[in-house]
Amino acid sequence: MPKVVAGAALAGVLLTGCGGADDPAPTGKGGEGGKKTSAAPPTPSGPSVLLTVPPAYSADKGWEQSLAWMPAKYSSKPPVAVGARSGTVAYVNTTEDGYVVQVRDASSGRIRFTSEPWEPPTSMAEAGNGTYDGDEAELPSVSTAFQDGREYVVLWAHGVQGGDALAKGKEVVRLLVFPMDASGSAVAPKRRIDIPVEVYGPNSEKGKGQDDLRVEDYGGGLQVHWNGLKKGAVAVDVTSGTIDACADACAEGRGQVKTSKGWVVSNYVLDLAEMPGSWHIQDDAPPGGWSMMDKSSMDGQYVSTIGGHLLTRWHTEAGGNFSTPLVAVHDAATGKLEASIVCERPRGDDAVSSPNGRFIAAGTVAFDLQRRHGTCLDAGESRKADVLVRSITDDGTAYGELATGPGKDPGAVEIDLSAGDGAPRLLPDGTRVPEWALPGAGVFLTPNPVNGLLISVLKQK
């Protein structure tokens, strides 16, 4: 296929499935069904849509996969995940027999394996459960996890299992676990696991909705978290299928992350992080904090977890009790302080990490853990808008977007976190930033306003 510049061409690629096969969504699961299209090539040709990308990436070198079956509006997170250790990209696709997960090498695009087709639990809307009556479809999604030295792919969906016209079904998150090193086609999962939940509505994209259902590995193995009417947290052993529902520790707070030493919780009143019976976040407070700090003050508020590191916020002496501009990073297992920085107005809690774990960020605050150095990217005297970090490479190049408000082009920036002052550099208009930065390649997601999602995996120069 001739190479074309992104724009109207994107719609054509998503409609034709160029770069890999795409089947209509299975009947009754968000589509009208239909016959299978041609099989995806084991090694795809280069990108047919040339995106505007940061200068470190080659727009015409790499591969792409279109997910034309996806609706324009959906409540789940995008059905794409990466294996940072294995250098792989996993995504959910469809056949006439059900949903499949497919895994490719990021560097070559070669297909490692395709799962057998699967019909997920009945969605909440179809089951008539809860109060959800919106127009956003709830779709299966995919995550990756690392346990006992091995990486796994987890195909998952939220919905109602069982039930009939008389009896209520059981609300669950169903997990299908595949070893990342599997190979072949129609691969069966090594384990199927049902996690009982009480969300009463659809899961939300990137945790932005009221139910905030997440299936992620925060550095201690796979975990399922949900809010809704009853908040819950479950750690999952993907090899045995056993689950830890945070019963004892969560009597004192909300479960945030399971570590090798126990559960980190945030207490119900002030959201302060602690591991009950082991440590409290204020045991190793960052320098520059408020002299009036105690366990009844909002010092050490939980923000997020990534790669075994906790991010928390604190008061400062200058700010008093009215703001928490001090941001700290702690070891999630021990609570020990690793780095901190004072920013003007830190914002955002979606944490990201470089594949090697040296660099992490949450919203407008980023850290080089090797240098124990922080960078503030919030708006201030010299910056008109917040910079929200989306991804970080192993060499410390962070990519982010300007928080410009609804309906406006966010603008793209890059930041060097490895040295210097970490000042953002504005990229040309229309530049897309990678959703994930893998060694040697960036993964870009481009939604179509009508329907479909284009995955572009582009090589670094």
Regions found by a protein language model. Give the residues of each.
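N-terminal "mature head" segments of proteins
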Residues: 11-153, 160, 166-169, 175-206, ...
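A structural motif specific to WD40 beta-propellers
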Residues: 110-113, 185-190, 244-245, 336-339, ...
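Repeated scaffold domains used in trafficking and secretory/extracellular systems
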Residues: 72-85, 119-146, 192-219, 246-267, ...
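Long, well-ordered mid-to-C-terminal structural blocks that present hydrophobic/aromatic surfaces
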Residues: 323-362, 366
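N-terminal export and membrane-targeting signals
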Residues: 1-9
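Structural motif
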Residues: 96-102, 161-178, 228-235, 267-281, ...
